[in-house]
Design a protein with these regions (language model features):
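Secretory targeting and sorting signals
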Residues: 2-36
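Extracellular glycan-associated modules
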Residues: 35, 39-52, 76, 107, ...
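Sequence contexts marking disulfide-bonded cysteines in secreted/extracellular proteins
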Residues: 41-43, 51-54, 99-108, 193, ...
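Short, hydrophobic/proline-enriched secondary-structure or compact coil segments at domain edges
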Residues: 65-78, 152-154, 180-181, 273, ...
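Short amphipathic beta-strand/extended segments with alternating polar/hydrophobic composition
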Residues: 79-91, 164-168, 283-290, 395-398, ...
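A motif-centric signal for short, conserved binding hotspots located
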Residues: 139
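Lectin-like carbohydrate-binding module/patch detector with strong preference for beta-trefoil
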Residues: 353-482
Length: 482
């Protein structure tokens, strides 16, 4: 379940209607600071007395004055690296710099810079108790509009993860903390664990209460959960808590395209879980009350590492989209949370209605869906091949009409057949049902047959022709759109 539903409908690109991160007069009262014309999330939290100790984003600045690097990419062709900065102080990422640097090859995000004064940068995670060393995200896999600018998010697929085990200023022991991230309900799975927040410093499961991270996904740790998710939950170690002692029927999940996921914990007695549409409206408090009473959570035993896309022991089977996130010192007020949510709304996160780029295989992140030799000959095979940097043979357009287009034609199911093993080919676009594809839970499904695009036998050898097959959730049926 690792593919966002980019072309299920035409998405309107939302332009920011002006920053709305102004704090209420009540929030500012007694803060001892003057209100800037524009206050971004970490300005808001600082004014409320709970400053950011970590601020990570590949899309935008999270302080009005920040004008440094957001993330670093590494080029596959020669190993060179470059930082991607903001366009201006308090602004959005200079995605054009990435496009230019990575032209003709692929790039990986190898570091996400902390914008806070603590400098808690995230790098690719090492091996842990539950998983081998992680890999970096494909830097071009998650294009998104933010503030009217085309930028990139972090496309977390199984095996991708980031970590900092030697942080500064992050809550330890029973100190209070808040954390939020902006993610998407269109790219989730039930693997453990799409987290952002506080974790163990030795990459091991050290027991109850040693984590304090916000989780988003469809993993129901304490059945029975309300619906099928995805849910915002608190990963407090040895459990994803929807509220209380784990099971919370009031937590109905957050299913909007873009989601603000928030968890805060006073470290000694209470925690809260909130979620909301990152594009409009406020936050819903799914839970606010006692910490779990099973033992080990009252008080908490936080260790102060920071993780993204993985569990505390480096469980790295998760999938998710990450656009921005912060961690605070102290337990933020609801008023501060609400003002941060208003600022997030103003960004206008939106997926482009039609995007072009590689379709990356879920069973091997170095392989892409390829139109053999970029040929426009009907019947040309659609195959697995090494990702080669958006050449004509791999530069697919995910169109709003449900087709996957390349080289002037469409991805086609041979003869409009529905049998397992039917070959996938290039054919002139003709509006046929055998050229329709829908992204569902990480799979590319042909609605007419109800079957999935499949890499036969998990064979990622160059030249393996793709087929139609009964959907089974296997990684050989997972595809990551541009």
């Amino acid at each position: 379940m690792t593919l966002r539903s980019r072309f299920a409908q035409v998405r309107r690109v939302l332009l920011a209607a002006g920053a709305s991160g102004a704090l209420t007069a009540g929030l500012l009262a007694g803060a001892g600071v003057s209100q800037a014309a524009v206050m971004l999330p970490c300005d808001i939290y600082a004014a409320a007395g709970t400053p950011c100790v970590a601020a990570h984003s590949t899309t935008r600045a999270l302080y009005a004055a920040y004008n440094g690097p957001l993330y670093q990419v590494k080029r596959a062709s020669d190993g060179a690296t470059t930082n991607i900065n903001t366009l201006a102080a308090g602004g959005y990422a200079n995605a054009a710099a990435q496009d230019s640097f990575c032209a003709g090859t692929t790039c990986t995000i190898i570091e996400i810079f902390d914008q806070s004064p603590q400098h808690n940068n995230l790098t690719i995670g090492p091996a842990g108790g539950a998983g081998g060393a992680d890999v970096g995200a494909n830097a071009a896999a998650l294009p998104v509009m933010a503030g009217g600018n085309r930028v990139y998010g972090v496309d977390v697929t199984p095996g991708v993860g980031y970590r900092d085990d030697a942080t500064s200023g992050v809550a330890t022991g029973s100190a209070p903390q808040g954390a939020y991230m902006v993610t998407s309900a269109t790219h989730v799975n039930s693997g453990c664990c799409f987290d952002y927040g506080n974790a163990e410093t030795n990459n091991r499961d050290n027991g109850n209460g040693h984590m304090d991270a916000v989780y988003f996904g469809t993993l129901c740790w304490f059945p029975t959960c309300n619906g099928s998710g995805p849910w915002v939950q608190a990963d407090l170690e040895n459990g994803l808590f929807g509220g209380g002692n784990g099971n919370n029927p009031n937590n109905a999940g957050d299913k909007t395209t873009f989601v603000t996921a928030l968890v805060k914990n006073n470290g000694t007695s209470t925690y809260a879980i909130k979620g909301g549409n990152a594009d409009s409206g406020g936050l819903t408090t799914w839970y606010s009350g006692s910490l779990p009473t099973q033992g080990g959570y009252i008080p908490m035993h936080q260790e102060g590492a920071i993780i993204l896309g993985i569990g505390g022991d480096n469980s790295n089977g998760s999938a998710g989209d990450f656009f921005e996130g912060v961690m605070t010192a102290g337990y933020p007020t609801d008023a501060a949370d609400n003002s941060v949510q208003a600022n997030i709304n103003s960004v206008g996160y939106a997926f482009p209605s039609s995007v072009t780029g590689p379709i990356v295989a879920g069973d091997n992140g170095s392989k892409c869906v390829d139109n053999n030799n970029g040929s426009g000959t009907p019947g040309n095979k659609v195959q697995m091949w090494d990702c080669d940097g958006n050449t004509a043979a791999q530069n697919w357009t995910v169109a709003s009409n449900g087709t996957l287009q390349i080289d002037g034609g469409c991805m086609d199911i041979t003869g409009a057949k529905t049998a397992n093993g039917t070959l996938i080919e290039w054919w002139t676009c003709n509006g046929g049902a055998n050229q329709q594809w829908q992204a569902q839970n990480g799979q590319l499904v042909n609605p007419a047959s109800g079957k999935c695009l499949d890499d036969p036998g998990f064979n990622t050898t160059n030249g393996t022709q793709l087929v139609l097959w009964t959907c089974n959730g296997g990684s050989n049926q997972q595809w990551h759109l541009p």
